[in-house]
């Protein structure tokens, strides 16, 4: 058996050793997991480990859980408006009772063709006055 045979045998033995080591480590890991799952729940150590495996961030002070409402709520509180200098002109004019849209009923339509045209004109006038972009409907207009 020459040098080539010794090298080939050592490579085969090292690969076999890696397979055996991998199998032993998998077996140990599965036994450990099985023992952890069937361990007594009253055991403080196993329950802490299990809680950590369920949520690894639970003991971290940097992690703060947000529910869906907190995550998507982008409304600004009125108390926060007082701390924003750029919002100060709007604070005096904010009111939840001031609507953006004019809620008055449109004028009744007339039946003649001429009055129908004037009715359409009145309708566009009421649409303009009901627009939230019209200055007199804006709650932020300073009078």
Swiss-Prot record:
Residues 110-143 have a biased composition (Polar residues). Coiled coil: none annotated. The keyword Transmembrane helix applies. It is found in: Golgi apparatus membrane. GO terms for cellular component: Golgi apparatus; Golgi membrane. The chain crosses the membrane at residues 4-24. It comes from the Eukaryota. It is a single-pass membrane protein. It comes from Schizosaccharomyces pombe (strain 972 / ATCC 24843). The keyword Metal-binding does not apply. This is Uncharacterized protein C607.07c. Keywords: Golgi apparatus, Membrane, Transmembrane, Transmembrane helix. Residues 97-143 are annotated as: Disordered.
């Amino acid at each position: 058996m020459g040098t080539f045979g010794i090298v080939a045998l050592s490579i085969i033995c090292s690969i076999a050793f890696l397979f055996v080591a991998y199998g032993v480590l998998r077996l140990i890991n599965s036994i450990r997991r099985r023992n952890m799952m069937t361990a007594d729940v009253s055991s403080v150590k196993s329950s802490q480990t299990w809680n950590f495996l369920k949520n690894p961030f639970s003991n971290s002070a940097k992690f703060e859980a947000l529910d869906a409402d907190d995550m998507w709520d982008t409304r600004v509180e009125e108390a926060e408006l007082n701390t924003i200098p750029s919002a100060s002109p709007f604070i005096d004019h904010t009111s939840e009772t001031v609507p953006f849209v004019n809620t008055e009923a449109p004028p009744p339509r007339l039946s003649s063709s001429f009055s129908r045209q004037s009715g359409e004109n009145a309708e566009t006038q009421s649409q303009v006055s009901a627009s939230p972009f019209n200055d007199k409907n804006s709650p932020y207009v300073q009078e």
